Amino acid sequence: MNTKLLFAALLCTTNAYASCGSSFCSVNTHWDTQGLVNDDTLRVDLRYSYAKADTLRGGSSKISPAQPAGSDTEIENLRTINQMLDLDLDYSITPKWNVAMDMPLVMRDHTHTFDSSISGPFVQESKFNGQGDVRVAAKYKFDSAEHHAGSGMSLGIKLPTGAIDKTMTPPDPANPTTPYALERSAQPGTGSTDMLLGAYYHNDIEDSPWGWFASGLLQSAVSTRDDYRPGNSFNLDLGAHYPFSPALTGLLQLNAQFKYRDTGLNANPASGGHSLNLSPGLSFVVAPKTNLYGFVQVALLQYANIDPADPGAGQLTAPWSFAVGVNHSY
């Protein structure tokens, strides 16, 4: 199948591994990295993803939250509901060169207990809808002597277009007139400019209905703001697809994610970690060049870094998530 490069970014993944549980479904929904679409001038993908982080984890184990004791600190004993709506545009300049842009809308509802020494423990909440960080990539497809296989790489940039000033209510009773800042890792944006390097390979097995792909993405902040640097991350996907009929295709992915700890004065030391997820899904052709698709992702392994100074302070994690979407080619 003749395909062109699509940026091998896991664009539905952002800010995974933070104490507030600001994670998203990490499934790969870029079809030409998987050899599932033909060359087209423009492709448009609209995707919704959902993850509810309500399991506190330290290392690979579930842990119990601290008990209120008037510590004037946050206790992550409740939940974070993460939703994202992604609009992904991919345009072919030449048969070998593409450009792509991802524009996310972040919808997040985070609650935790504030352990006040003045009023006693109470629930704080931050709920918002806001633009996330936009990503732009230039992509190149390598020549291949095999018509059933393809590979490529990409170089991109994540721009600091998302807000970093969201707050929680009510504020700290000790400072009732001062807005209480939401943790930086749970903001719509990171405030950083990141470089993105991706690569992929796909192969439709000869004399077989099966096809498979592998893709990876490295992300690293090169410019930061306000004493906060998100940790470097690496995502790796391995997947397979099988056509049940001309219109219905079964999908299966194994998604691995590795993220270093955030750093800076405004970073939470309880951040970063690694995970391995299994993601079965389906894609259905509803009209010429138009597909509907869906995935459910289940965590096989989750490891959440703890705060070295406070081993009892873990991170909220999501045991499962899902993504649904529609894509159309022109």
Model-derived regions, located:
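Residues on the lipid-exposed face of transmembrane beta-strands in outer-membrane beta-barrel proteins
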Residues: 46-48, 87-91, 101, 136-140, ...
